[in-house]
């Protein structure tokens, strides 16, 4: 699964905070992902950021990721969901 963040113009970014959705619902269960990666768009290609801190998937808090600064128009989270569960993002902050 993936979700994208588009800027109106090229922007330098160096970190993100992701608050993962995790709760039980009558329609299905939502869990933090098993894993995730962050990509940025360079030209027509997606490249993984050079992470400077661990990728975390903790529930009930922001999961902070520092990375080598990049200038881009788009970011993309690619998440590997836990088997049998849905996933989601409550909030995604970009700095």
Question: Can you describe what each PLM-predicted range is?
Answer:
Residues 1-50, 56-95:
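Aromatic, loop-rich ligand-recognition surfaces of beta-strand-rich domains
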